[in-house]
Amino acid sequence: MKENETLKQIVLKTLEESVNSLISSFPEVEKETFKIKIEYSRDEKFGDYSTSFALENSKLLKRNPIQVSKELVEILQKRTDLFEKVDFTPPGFVNFRISTSFLLNYIETSVLSGNYFPKVDLPLKINLEFVSANPTGPLNIVSARAAANGDTMASLLKAIGHNVDKEFYINDYGNQVFLLGVSTLVRIRELKGEEGTQQETTDDTPIEIILEKNILPAEGYRGEYIKDIASSLLKDPKKNVTIENLLKQKKYKELAELCAVWTIENNLIWQRKDLDAFGVEFDRYFSERTLHEADKVLSVMKDLEKSGKIFQEDGKKVFRSTEYGDDKDRVVVRDDGRPTYLLADIAYHKDKIERGYDKIYDIWGPDHHGYISRLSGAVQSLGYKKENFKVIISQQVNLLESGQKVKMSKRAGSFQTMSDLIGFLGKHGKDVGRYFFVMRSLDAPLDFDLDLAKDESDKNPVFYLQYAHARICSIFKEVGDQTSKEATAILEMSEERKRLLFWIARFPEEIFDSANAMEPHRVTNYLQSFAKAFTSFYLAKDNRLKDASKEVRLGLARICLAAKNVLAEGLKLIGVSAPERMEKEN
């Protein structure tokens, strides 16, 4: 057995060798044309793994799949060191049952030796950007989902040997940021006793009128947090003096720009505090403003023009994004010379490329799907390979309470924040929040059941896993933590014991496959199935360590230790704690 291989890789390699041996007697067949793959048996009674090789390749083989399967079984049955049983199921499936001795040896060299995760042959330098919420307010629930999944993806990729930088892009430039400053200024003037007006505005209302009459813009921010920020700015002696001076001089626009900077500073402090509470740390916070200040936004135009992907239309500079699947070509420089948001994004990704990343991954919100083709096209026009840039869309989150959706609205001020959610879930907010957000694939909407999340029984999937870990810890406290590899090898293998061994041995490949697919939800799916296998083992009478003979106890304890390691490491990857003691362990 080669170190750094998963059990699935070992079985697949053995199958490939057996197929090559089989078709060596078929000179008219080219082995390179074959599809050879294995999957987990859909029904455990048939085995641990299965392959439909004979069915999928019957035309190429020009032979009956039943006959091919039977011949393949004969070859595979010779590997008695690896397989306990290999058999055939019509109309052409070959099923594999891994031998107990092989499982035990594999577990010893992986889960019980600390070599949990196989490493990739070629480690990559990866940039993983996620959350990147506008600094115009607290982080919302969609950002929380991106945070949990992005952080878990980074952990998975690092676990298998990649070098990963986690990055947060700060959108601190542009009109929306200015409107944030205007919104804060309106609240400051109100707090100073200046009567504002409730006059309705539109997107076309001149900013001079909005500032002169102290009107909250139509696209402004109405949340209570804006009032809190305004109040805190007035309590700062230096800032208050600046505010007073600029108000007296009626330099409202200059003051609004300052308020935008100050408000963003406050919001970033809040956002980072929320992320810290959620166990998410970034390697880099990258400011969009720095790109503009370094003239990197307009200068990237030279690269795009060199690629021949820019044309002029009505005084505007337009990127040929339709060549990359976009529904229309996109303006990157307006007729007044101002860059669009797209050009800033292109400049940002050029900066990533120049930092030498082999792979660039972005996690975006649910309303950005149409943006992928234009940015991907721009990245390709800069000479970066299409396959090295990937955008993952984090779909919408629906909070459910008593089966009903809880509404969210950002600008109206009645939305649920990441901080609100963690607080609502109480002392277990971080663990429960992170786990629930990772439970479903990012490309599907998530119904976040608040009632289930608050439930501290084992109906809650987080507590189900944590109780399993705590049970094992309590077992060791009761009978001691001594184990024996030799005692495990001579244990009688009941169905529950053998099933648990296979689920333990699957841990490295589940993590390896989840990391390569960048699908964190596969980890939670595996852990739930694993915990069920452990619970069946735990409840079986012949697995009660305190009632067993010393030799049996030492063998069972070895299995429990491996199970404990799987639970602890699996939970750690998704940022969830593995407590040794909980109020309910039995």
Swiss-Prot record:
It catalyses: tRNA(Arg) + L-arginine + ATP = L-arginyl-tRNA(Arg) + AMP + diphosphate. GO terms for cellular component: cytoplasm. Signal peptide: none annotated. It is found in: Cytoplasm. GO terms for biological process: arginyl-tRNA aminoacylation. Its EC number is 6.1.1.19. SUPFAM superfamilies: Anticodon-binding domain of a subclass of class I aminoacyl-tRNA synthetases, Arginyl-tRNA synthetase (ArgRS), N-terminal 'additional' domain, Nucleotidylyl transferase. Pfam families: Arg_tRNA_synt_N, DALR_1, tRNA-synt_1d. GO terms for molecular function: arginine-tRNA ligase activity; ATP binding. Keywords: Aminoacyl-tRNA synthetase, ATP-binding, Cytoplasm, Ligase, Nucleotide-binding, Protein biosynthesis. A motif ('HIGH' region) lies at residues 133-143. Belongs to the class-I aminoacyl-tRNA synthetase family. Monomer. NCBIfam families: argS. This is Arginine--tRNA ligase. It comes from Leptospira interrogans serogroup Icterohaemorrhagiae serovar Lai (strain 56601). The lineage of its organism: Bacteria, Pseudomonadati, Spirochaetota, Spirochaetia, Leptospirales.
